[in-house]
Amino acid sequence: LLFPLFILLSNCEAQPQRELFNVLAGKDHQGPVLLGWHATGTHSARCSFDEFVRCDAGKIVCPDGTNAVLSAVAFEREVELTFSRPLVPGKRQEIRARVTDMVGNSLSFTVGIWGYNANPPELRINEFVTKGSSTNPDRVELYVKQGGNLAGITLYDGMSGSFDSECILPAFAVSAGDHVVIEYGERLRGIHPIEFWGGEVGLGANNGVISLYDAPEGRIIDAVLYSNRTSSSDEQYGGFGTKKVQQRAVLLQESGEWKPIPIVPESGVDSTYCTATRSICRTPGAADTDRAADWHVVPTGKASFGNENEKESYHP
């Protein structure tokens, strides 16, 4: 599921630019820059900027008419918004707003704020296949360590800042010990107890990053790097083969969700022997160290999506 998000700027550029000053007046002529936005409660959200701002609730609207902003309190570089109705978990509330800095430069923007999930489950990526077939498609399994509601939980083929696919899960209660399967392809086959459709486009076959967040562009929960390459595989992209995979590896390194650092292709889980029926899964009982050693490739036909992981490893 892909949702558009865009920013409309007034009196400033969409990309960071050099600060401009009126030499005679000594005034700053660059508008504020929006740095981030997220829900902070069932009826509240926060927008962050690169400088002190002012904001009037009358300058903020919800275009779809389903909600309204009751107040907008600016404190230094942040604006706290209060809504008349709840921000529904797993749903996107669009707002249009205008803020000004201390000398009157303005920024107009439109963003989508995802509803606040007060009861997210504790999850980890548990198993995946990247070389799927029509009968055994690409899949990712999430293991529920502590129960909660899946609303807004987001799985990326990539990282939130660079991805090929984004799967935003709906409101759905899960319990500790559940296995949640995200399946890619034309349609769901209906063979797993808890499953969701990830889209028609599957995962990168040999090299990539799979990551899990508490909301679209939210806080990262877990991630895994997989590769069949080494640092010497190429000189241009650090061995990762393509610019986008290298970029995602850099983002993963910055997140702190994979080790060792610096991240190189050979520090990922070796995907060489993964097939449609030989999945890559966490080794049962192994500690979660955010390293390749936490994972193994299972024997042919032993993929265990929706069930306990296979302990045996494939040996060529």
Question: What residue ranges belong to the model's regions?
Answer:
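Residue-level recognition of beta-strand termini and adjacent short loop/turns
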Residues: G41, F75-R77
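A short glycine/threonine-centered beta-strand motif
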Residues: G41-R54, N136-G147, Y213
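Short, surface-exposed alpha-helix to beta-strand junction/turn motifs within ectodomains of secreted
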Residues: A45-S71, I153-L155
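Conserved structural position at the C-terminal beta-strand
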Residues: A97-V99
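Solvent-exposed beta-edge/loop recognition patches
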Residues: N11, A74, P86-P89, P170-P316
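Sec-dependent bacterial lipoprotein signal peptides
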Residues: L1-N11
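Surface-exposed loop/edge segments in extracytoplasmic proteins
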Residues: D64-A72, S162-I168, G218-D222
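A structural motif detector for short, solvent-exposed N-terminal "entry" segments of globular domains
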Residues: E13-K27, H38, N105-F163, G202-G204, ...
